[in-house]
Amino acid sequence: IGDALVNLGQKDLLIDTQGNWGDIRTGDRSAAPRYIEARLSQFALEVAFNKPITETSPSYDGRKDEPIALPMKFPLLLAQGAEGIAVGLSTKILPHNFNELLRSSIQILKEKPFKIFPDFQTGGLIDVTHYNNGKRGGKVRVRAHIDIVDKHTLKISSIPYNTTTTHLIDSIVKANNSGKLKVKNIEDNTAEEIEIIINLVK
């Protein structure tokens, strides 16, 4: 339950968080569950609870009723993203942009066409050439956003989905050790925004 709650809290949509909840950009883990606090966000209270249409069942001790499922007023699965695997089958639903989902939902209600593509908290560049509208067999390619500061300096300001700054820096170090790159040093200045400075050998 703790890991699932942290995963929800890091998406910054359903849970108002307090304490150290870790960082999906750097890969830093959250504090132990007893050291973090959570409450449902105002958004969650608005879209996740609709008493007239919510089916319930008795709680484990029979004293209260608890919801079997929460019918959403918002395409939460597309916003959060999800992945899973079973015997011979797997699925991966990539996260999408909150505002784009709202606009697309309005288009559906108006019975008008729309296009929507995945969007990631960590930023990065995405190639949706072979996305296939999210259907089976579709794929996307993501990469870091790299700016050339000068001929000896590169700056990374966003990273691919499911990659951390720590993992990215490790891969740069390995490339340097194998001779694919010639790096003088790497500065990780990531705080509120991602910033990795790569100083190349002159």
Give a label for each model feature:
Residues 139-202:
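Gly/Lys-enriched N-terminal cap/neck module of very large, oligomeric protein machines
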